[in-house]
Amino acid sequence: MKAGIHPAYNEISVICACGHSLKTRSTHKGDMRVEICSSCHPFFTGKQKLMDTAGRIDRFEKKYKASRVGKAAPTT
């Protein structure tokens, strides 16, 4: 490899908004701040919220049922 053309590879701190901090190596200069990390992300913590899609569909149909009454299905 050619000398002098590669960026410096230094140890930096990655600091999350939740307060968790970790050390890594990067060409980034200075500390890096992130909004979410594996310590606070719902997928990794097991506190994942599942969406109730069946309930959402029922609410949609209930809301727009009145506008569909009396309309014939389109013919193609």
Swiss-Prot record:
Example of a GO biological process term: translation
Keyword Oxidoreductase (UniProt): no
UniProt cofactor(s): Zn(2+)
Key words, A-Z: Metal-binding, Ribonucleoprotein, Ribosomal protein, RNA-binding, rRNA-binding, Zinc
SUPFAM superfamilies, alphabetized: L28p-like
Binding site for Zn(2+): 16, 18, 37, 40
GO cellular component: ribonucleoprotein complex; ribosome
Pfam families: Ribosomal_L31
Keyword Metal-binding: yes
GO molecular function: metal ion binding; rRNA binding; structural constituent of ribosome
Subunit structure: Part of the 50S ribosomal subunit.
Descriptive protein name: Large ribosomal subunit protein bL31
Species: Solibacter usitatus (strain Ellin6076)
Highest classification ranks of the organism: Bacteria, Pseudomonadati, Acidobacteriota, Terriglobia, Bryobacterales
